[in-house]
Amino acid sequence: MAQAWAFLLPVLVFGSYVTSLFFPSYISGPLCGGDGGGRSLFLCAQAPKDQDPSPAVSTMYKTAFHFQPAKNWMNDPSGPMYFNGFYHEFYQYNLNGPIFGDIVWGHSVSTDLVNWIGLEPALVRDTPSDIDGCWTGSVTILPGGKPVIIYTGGDKDQHQAQNIAFPKNRSDPYLREWIKAANNPVLRPDEPGMNSIEFRDPTTGWIGPDGLWRMAVGGELNGYSAALLYKSEDFLNWTKVDHPLYSHNGSNMWECPDFFAVLPGNNAGLDLSAAIPQGAKHALKMSVDSVDKYMIGVYDLQRDAFVPDNVVDDRRLWLRIDYGTFYASKSFFDSNKNRRIIWGWSRETDSPSDDLEKGWAGLHTIPRTIWLADNGKQLLQWPVEEIESLRTNEISHQGIELNKGDLFEIKEVDAFQADVEIGFELASIDDADPFDPSWLLDPEKHCGEAGASVPGGIGPFGLVILASDNMDEHTEVYFRVYKSQEKYMVLMCSDLRRSSLRPDLEKPAYGGFFEFDLEKERKISLRTLIDRSAVESFGGGGRVCITSRVYPAVLADVGRAHIYAFNNGSATVRVPQLSAWTMRKAQVNVEKGWSAI
């Protein structure tokens, strides 16, 4: 369960090119937004003064192809699975409004991970062990094709325990009704050293070599954060193993742990309960510090423990699933297409009063295929192929050269609903600026200090999206290339500081680094999906992913927006291929299996 309450505190154009006059070395104050001569200047040191929103917070911020219910609050994905021809998405849902509270398990089904039918809640708060909330959990498919939900419930004193539910009728293709086990809760935090209010979010179960089921639960043990390990013969009666799957003494409570097997360089998924191929690694993910982090290592069967390849004490250096507004992710093995899929919760970053006016809050990111890179060091992610079924009106350009200060407008696509794929080829790598390893501790800070208005040797180059006519509003997604002693480091940023003129918004600069062998690859790829208030960007083939929430006034006012490719580095950047599509609207919880969705 994500502790959601913590988040509530709250042109002069020549053809398609724009001249280098758009890139003064550093502009501020009255020059921001224009130079007095009709030219648009967007790389400002200081954003224009906020303006009040439209009389009503526009429904235009509702996404067109992301998963979200028609109304009210949602947070964590819970128990995704593929079963009997349908994908099931359960999620944390408030039946009563667009604020956190009264949490039940929402439920939707799909055949393609794009279009969803909303159903009645699978689990509601109606027993003593879950009266405070039906919190996050997982689904495990038992032998014989028997799905079982295991989830965290809170009692009247907010003590947490794990509960189980089974489908009432497995022949129902939608699995609408679920029956809770009579002996719930099946797992309590009764052991010495455990914290009864920090014990939640059980993982999908897996079978060990001894034939026993295993499961991890996020918790605190003797003040340490841990993925606690449990065993069972029948999935109903559980015994705590005398050591955790893994623990750490320097981090906050681990929420929403996830544990799965991956094979280096192979994007096929692995079922953790099946035979794991030789050479496979394991990933342990935890939601902590308001972000999702992970480690790569091995599952030591003799010790029944996860062993990281590299033990990093400073959790600021732990690997990240996503560097933006992304939390409480959940993965599952998709037996339909033999892949592992992950998605996360992206919260709103406007104000709670905006959410009340909108009548909804929260969405899930586009489902992503997730696998291990060839070098076995990091996870890669890419939107599932099904999302491409929404593409229409393809625009394609080849052989674009971007010199310092150039903007190239990507026209004839819907700038509010678009999928853009672009590759940047570097003519020279000699101009890369030196890399400072201390930047790894806070890449967001470095993105803020070295924004797109600050020229570098190689970069910044990337995309300007959701840009208003006069550039007063725009979001930048871009790269900078640095030279370390024996390798190149690429910084990817998603800078929202000038994304909107509306007040009371979070407008940070997100960022993450990745290693890149520029001498071999020479090209850095970027894919950005724009869906009104949600932007998901994938850099370097999925090495860094950044989810952003943006609320430009131009969208609320039903105005016009623009997309540009740009370069503000000294080195020329070539774009061998640029493709963009308008994205059609998906049918997300519009077809109702239940009147309240």
From Swiss-Prot:
pH dependence, entry free text: Optimum pH is 4.5-5.5. Inactive above pH 7.5.
Keywords: Disulfide bond, Glycoprotein, Glycosidase, Hydrolase, Signal
Lineage top rank: taxon: Eukaryota
Regulation: Inhibited by sucrose.
Signal peptide residues on this chain, from the entry's feature table: 1-20
Keyword Signal: yes
Protein's job: Hydrolyzes inulin-type beta-(2,1)-fructans and beta-(2,1)-linkages in branched fructans. Has low activity against beta-(2,6)-linked fructans. May play a role as a beta-(2,1)-trimmer during graminan biosynthesis.
Temperature and thermostability: Optimum temperature is 30-40 degrees Celsius.
One GO BP: carbohydrate metabolic process
Protein name according to UniProt: Fructan 1-exohydrolase w1
Native organism: Triticum aestivum
EC number: 3.2.1.153
Reactions that this protein is recorded to catalyse: Hydrolysis of terminal, non-reducing (2->1)-linked beta-D-fructofuranose residues in fructans
GO MF annotation: an example: fructan beta-(2,1)-fructosidase activity
Alphabetical list of InterPro entries matching this protein: ConA-like_dom_sf (IPR013320), Fructan_Metab_Enzymes (IPR050551), Glyco_hydro_32 (IPR001362), Glyco_hydro_32_C (IPR013189), Glyco_hydro_32_N (IPR013148), Glyco_hydro_beta-prop_sf (IPR023296)
Keyword Glycoprotein: yes
Glycosylation, residue list: 169, 237, 249, 568
Gene3D superfamilies: Exo-inulinase, domain 1, Glycosyl hydrolase domain, family 43
Similarity section: Belongs to the glycosyl hydrolase 32 family.
Pfam families on file: Glyco_hydro_32C, Glyco_hydro_32N
